[in-house]
Amino acid sequence: MHRKTLAELAAGLERREFSSVELTQAHLARIERLDPALNSFITTTPEIALAQARAADERLAKGEAGPLTGIPIAQKDIFCTKGVRTSCGSRMLDSFVSPYDACVVERFNAAGAVMLGKLNMDEFAMGSSNETSYYGPVKNPWNTATVPGGSSGGSAAAVAARLVPGATGTDTGGSIRQPAAFCGITGLKPTYGRVSRWGMIAFASSLDQAGPMARTAEDCAIMLQTMAGFDERDSTCVDRPVPDYRAALGNDLDGLRIGLPKEFFGEGLDPAIAGLIHAAVDEYRRLGAIVREISLPNMHLSVPAYYVVAPAECSSNLARFDGVRFGHRCENPTDLADLYTRSRGEGFGAEVKRRILIGTYALSAGYYDAYYLKAQKIRRLISEDFRRAFEEVDVIMGPTAPSVAFEFGAKSADPIAMYLSDIYTIAVNLAGLPGMSIPVGFSNGLPVGMQIIGGYFSEDRLLNVAHRYQQATDWHTRTPAGIAD
Amino acid sequence: MEWETVIGLEIHAQLATRSKIFSGAPTAYGAEPNTQACAIDLGLPGVLPVLNREAVRMAVKFGLAIGAEIAPVSVFARKNYFYPDLPKGYQISQYDLPVVARGKLSINVDGKALTIGITRAHLEEDAGKSLHEDFHGYTGIDLNRAGTPLLEIVSEPDLRSAKEAVAYMKKLHALVRYLEICDGNMQEGSFRCDANVSVRPKGQTKFGTRAEIKNLNSFRFVEKAINHEIARQIEILEGGGEVIQETRLYDSVKDETRSMRSKEEANDYRYFPDPDLLPLEISSGFIEEVKATLPELPDAKRDRFKAQYGLSDYDAEVLTASREMADFYETVVREAAGDPKLCANWVMVELSGLLNKDGLEITASKIDAAGLASLVRRIADATISGKIAKQVLETMWNEGGSADDIIERQGLKQITDTGAIESIIDQIIAANPEQLAQYRAGKDKLFGFFVGQAMKATQGKANPAQLNELLKKKLQ
């Protein structure tokens, strides 16, 4: 059953080829067997899963099922789940059991999906390799000596290893797209405001966005259909109708205007990846698309701007983890300052501390204008670059990441090198645009992802563009050796 | 050297919304600790704020009432600092772009009219409370207050004495209650004040170094703390010292201010726009909608009272000091259908005396406006004299009942029958031949003696005007 895509499983459930309980048990068994080597789950929730599966089977029997009813999924451990530990990959929240569900979790529950557990991630979503998790790194199923990418590395690895047909991720600077690329799966970061952030533990509020991670664009469409939509509890969530994503998948791509930004193909890009992207673009030409080179002149400013804005917001967002009301508290604090410094010192890992320090500095009196305000100006310039580009093209394509998955430890000593692995994805978050990554081939036996960027709220088009490519190619069906069975 | 004081006030008015500024939790005061705080107020991971429309409406109402500009776009910012009763580690406030800017308020001090500038008024959330008692060396945290909406009203440094500061604060206090945007309860902290105080040699234009005195929660403390601070600063300056910029706390028990933290120790709040909240846009339509709900404001009401009821400046000022007082007075006038000045006197002097004695607000008066009006009517129609009326009022206050019932039951009806009064006068004159002789010999003072005797004989019920007239005639 694990070989089937989410859409195929939904069809199987509908036809009663198997029950949700059977499906759930099969996936739980795979997790038990394969995940010790991968470490993609922080928490598994078999009891909840089986109860949800039984309820789903009843719904299916009554004919009250939707496309996600009875489908096993897993949540990135950044989403609050009622009664279940929600750790955010941090020692700080190792003991935190959320009293409420995130909006995304509520919506999957309402749709009748089955939650298998909570997925590993970089601590507080800060990282590009999953090496910052308090629960240890996730291994890339394609080569367990390499990283799965981050921060949604657990989600990407679990989907790639067929432990779950679909998982949620969050993307602040590439955290859905880059691990999707490293693990050879399909991931979509929606437009900022498309999916509610209620109950999603904030890293950088103006950049964070939840999205689906699955094997195919079609599966992402099914998941996004449930995730997207207005939620009055999130003031940044946009009240705008959600289109029928699956209905748009079949549209043909005749005359589709594709832009290739020259800034995405310059220095620092692995030539093998460049070759695969061009090959994928050629495939789009065959599907009727028109390709032209474009320019996003301020792209080189995106990483520095991001590493001011995101740490600034995180330094404030993470202030609530103070050992007073919930989360880690140090033993026997002597006074208030000791309680704060030791609880936070012990609870947070090195990368989180680095970003809190950078952000605190950037917001300090006397530095605010030079850093934070300037970064916000750059953000506007980058948005403007995209706005101009979308006057000429419908979608932008390029590499998702400059390299394939790297080995553990390769970049962990050099934060700048690590930050540059998000060089192509960060601008999309700064502009608030939707972006996808789809598998387009392999280099040295590791998957390569291509990024597709669209205008605001063009998720339907992105999914359509990705789906048509997946209809014509089979890169997305490749399965890591050793876990195929 | 002659010194001039410069004062600016920052007043925090708790807005009278039913729910909190960024959550749906109730704002009720006095509940069991941590029972009025929801996930958002607790700052749990993943929660997000949603702005309370009612709080914005109230801020706009205030802005309109002080003739201020209502910002078409204002921004919520995070003020970052660590404190156990600040759940998120930041307070959501407004910084660069407040919702209300550049208003003014007129005050009256010793008969002098002054206009005080209001720099800005912005919306923000309150923090919780740290409880240091009864926890065996630990500190308790009560987050019921966390997230309560506040309007911080910042004045220009236009005030020149503690007296002016108090007059300004009282005026503002009346205004927010007129507008029904704040209950004004100072004991519960619904209306509190920080004062920025500095002194400078008279004639100097540059401001002196200021000290900020925190958390003054009564008019009396504001006056005492400011006066104390002025004296402290002058003493330092006259001794050749320098005032240092710092935050000071007023100790009402010792009647002194003491240093809380210096400028160097001050927090760097690292303000930045809150990314969880979009800029607040206020349309002209919304402003018009709010404008339509504005009540008659204190100054307008005072002027109307003077014109409509012929009251003095002082009486009009006192009667419009609160909306409740003004409403009470106008009900008395309407019900009594008579002399507005007489009504003013009975509300301001006699009833207020009883209220003060029992420490009650006009809204808790034991005699309602209609009851007082019926008493005033009996004075106006000469059923009883003013002196008897005071007696009736006391009975109404202490025992309840209507004025007419009390007058009837106690037989207090004034004697207006000329024949009856004349016969009493005749008896008194007959009984006091000596005094009569002296009076007729020119000792005019004895007129009072005869009045007294007549009142004594009638238990004060003789109509005073009639009695005077008849006595004069008979004594001639």
UniProtKB/Swiss-Prot annotation, chain B:
Recorded superkingdom: Bacteria
Biological process (GO), any one: translation
Enzyme class: ligase
Entry coiled-coil feature ranges: none
EC number: 6.3.5.-
Reactions that this protein is recorded to catalyse: L-glutamyl-tRNA(Gln) + L-glutamine + ATP + H2O = L-glutaminyl-tRNA(Gln) + L-glutamate + ADP + phosphate + H(+); L-aspartyl-tRNA(Asn) + L-glutamine + ATP + H2O = L-asparaginyl-tRNA(Asn) + L-glutamate + ADP + phosphate + 2 H(+)
SUPFAM superfamilies referenced in this protein's UniProt entry, alphabetically: GatB/YqeY motif, Glutamine synthetase/guanido kinase
UniProt keyword terms in alphabetical order: ATP-binding, Ligase, Nucleotide-binding, Protein biosynthesis
Entry annotated with the keyword Ligase: yes
Pfam families: GatB_N, GatB_Yqey
Task of the protein: Allows the formation of correctly charged Asn-tRNA(Asn) or Gln-tRNA(Gln) through the transamidation of misacylated Asp-tRNA(Asn) or Glu-tRNA(Gln) in organisms which lack either or both of asparaginyl-tRNA or glutaminyl-tRNA synthetases. The reaction takes place in the presence of glutamine and ATP through an activated phospho-Asp-tRNA(Asn) or phospho-Glu-tRNA(Gln).
UniProt cross-references to PANTHER family, sorted A to Z: GLUTAMYL-TRNA GLN AMIDOTRANSFERASE SUBUNIT B MITOCHONDRIAL AND PROKARYOTIC PET112-RELATED, GLUTAMYL-TRNA(GLN) AMIDOTRANSFERASE SUBUNIT B, MITOCHONDRIAL
HAMAP family on file: GatB
The protein, known as: Aspartyl/glutamyl-tRNA(Asn/Gln) amidotransferase subunit B
Protein species of origin: Methylococcus capsulatus (strain ATCC 33009 / NCIMB 11132 / Bath)
Classification lineage: Bacteria, Pseudomonadati, Pseudomonadota, Gammaproteobacteria, Methylococcales
